[in-house]
Amino acid sequence: MTFTTTRLTLAALLLGASALSATAQDFTPENPECIAPANPGGGWDFTCRQVGKSLQDLGLLDKTMQVVNLAGGGGGVAYAEVVNKRADDNDLLVGAASAPATRLAQGAYPGNTMDQVRWLASIGADYGVVAVAADSEIDDLPELLEMIKTDPTSISVAGGSAVGGWDHLKVLIAANAYGVEDVRRVKYIAFDGGGEAVTQLLAGSVQAFTGDLSEAKGFVDSGDIRVIAVLSPERLEGEFSDFATAREQGVDAIGANWRGFYAPGGMSDAAYDVWVSKVSDLYASDEWKAT
């Protein structure tokens, strides 16, 4: 699993799980579903599919969780769908992350507010990355940022969140740390999910990609892209240990994207408590830690 989890996250999950009542135990999801607010291949899609599979593998769900991709508006299309049409659906989870929380705080989902849904759980932090195509002549993060600093129009950076969303903010954080005076000139192009953004990178439409490790990993394994920086405080362990951090390249930029779920605002207390308990049990399992 490419998420980095914390004790604070686990404590929050267990606190929610402690509220599980006898009534809640009677609820069983009939047709479990997870909405991924982006096209297939991105971090939200990965989160829904991996969590759904793990819940079933652990016996926490006895039915397959259906994953529905609903892209648009940096998560806004999915949010509006849940609020307006699925508000009392007890079987539904929706992939959440820093992006929708940021967009809601910015008032970027017209007519919607954060209290219209029930925030369910965070399952960990997915560190940001900056990547280029495998055959790119750009070797490292400082080289990319120097090109942006010299001529912002020469470099287009693709991401899977809307303008002003988390993928956009990550490249701005790095550019600001490098000394780019007017980060508003950084040329960011938004796509409906990290998978689509990487596709445009491979097509040569853009020169770099900003996203999360979970959505980049498959493209690294296939030899399509190279990660030139991870926005983590220090090098990650295991299979990610070869990826240099921005900080060790002299760019003091850190960006962790929390990932988790929210539920419809009208979900019953019984259903909500059961979902919190299931995700908490998943989080604490050895199987989850090993994936």
Briefly describe each language-model feature range.
Residues 24-116, 163, 180-208, 286:
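N-terminal (or domain-start) structured segment
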Residues 71, 153-154, 159-243:
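Ligand-binding pocket segment of bilobal, Venus flytrap-like solute-binding proteins
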Residues 91-94, 111-130, 156-158, 248-252:
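A structural signal for short loop-to-beta-strand junctions that line the ligand-binding cleft
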Residues 139, 215-287:
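C-terminal lobe and pocket-closing loops
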